[in-house]
Regions:
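N-terminal ordered "arm"
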Residues: 1-61
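Short beta-strand micro-motifs in enzyme catalytic cores
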Residues: 4-6, 100-102, 192
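A structural signal for short, well-ordered beta-strand segments and their strand-loop junctions
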Residues: 7, 83-88, 195, 214-217
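Acidic, proline/glycine-rich low-complexity IDRs
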Residues: 18-22, 113-237
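Intrinsically disordered, low-complexity boundary segments flanking structured domains
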Residues: 41-43, 71-74, 87-93, 170-171, ...
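Extended, non-catalytic structural segments that build the interaction scaffolds
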Residues: 57-64, 188-192
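Aromatic- and glycine-enriched beta-alpha-beta binding-site module
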Residues: 60-126
Length: 237
């Protein structure tokens, strides 16, 4: 099966919060509820003496939001408009300020584009085996493969069948072959990278916007991708 979607993984150093006394009405974590966030992007600081890139991770207080350059924004807006708001987010580097940057505010997620027939999940069950004076001191765990027919079934299972020590782990994730979106965002699978199509990957590379980023095939599990013997070596020497 051909690879049709990739995780756009950003390895440029994470921006840091540039504190400004009296700064008000600033963004925080994204709520993943589709409601547009209120406020302005807090000032973001990157390392001195590094050339600018087109993608950055935002400071940790902003969670999974991404910082992108104006030219990336223009590329993305040419091919899809309704799923992300782009909020001005100047980048500070020493005494310099670069205004041509934006931070993402995702208002539409595409979890229904996941192919549940091909995707694989693991049920990670945890429980308390022993307590001392009411304090858990010994735990048990079990890992089993689990299948879901659709997104609703997965959400319902997680809501009603799991205790606080258990979770569903995504092992391999496939996007439907008939998905037409060039890039998507997901919220229910523990993957918060921008997911992009092969064509968009090619466009980013051709326009030399790929400094400090890598494209991990979405279908390859993390444990098979990284490490000294991982499949990443086939893509990045």
């Amino acid at each position: 099966m051909e690879i049709n979607y990739y995780q756009l993984q950003i390895f440029n150093a994470r921006a840091k919060r540039y504190s400004t006394e009296g700064e008000e009405n600033t963004l925080g974590y994204m709520n993943f509820d589709g409601v547009p966030s209120l406020g302005n992007a807090p000032k973001q600081l990157i390392k001195d003496k590094t050339s600018l890139a087109d993608f950055y991770l935002s400071s940790s207080d902003l969670g999974s939001r991404k910082i992108i350059s104006s030219r990336v924004k223009e590329l993305f807006e040419r091919i899809r408009l309704e799923n992300v708001r782009y909020i001005p987010c100047p980048i500070h580097q020493g005494k310099k300020v670069f205004k041509e940057f934006w931070i993402t505010d995702v208002i539409h997620f595409d979890d229904n584009e996941v192919d549940f027939n091909l995707s694989k999940f693991e049920l990670c069950e945890g429980w308390v085996e022993e307590e001392v004076n009411g304090i858990p001191v010994k735990f048990g765990e079990r890992f089993t493969e689990i299948k879901f027919q659709n997104l609703g079934e997965k959400i319902e299972f997680e809501k009603n069948k799991l205790n606080h020590l258990s979770k569903i782990r995504t092992v391999t994730l496939f996007i439907k072959q008939d998905c037409l979106f060039p890039f998507i965002y997901l919220k229910e699978f523990g993957i918060y990278d921008i997911i992009i199509s092969y064509k968009l990957k090619e466009a980013i590379q051709q326009q030399k916007m790929d400094k400090g980023i890598e494209f991990k095939p979405l279908e390859i599990p993390e444990e098979e991708w990284g490490g000294p013997n991982g499949l990443r070596k086939q893509f990045y020497s």
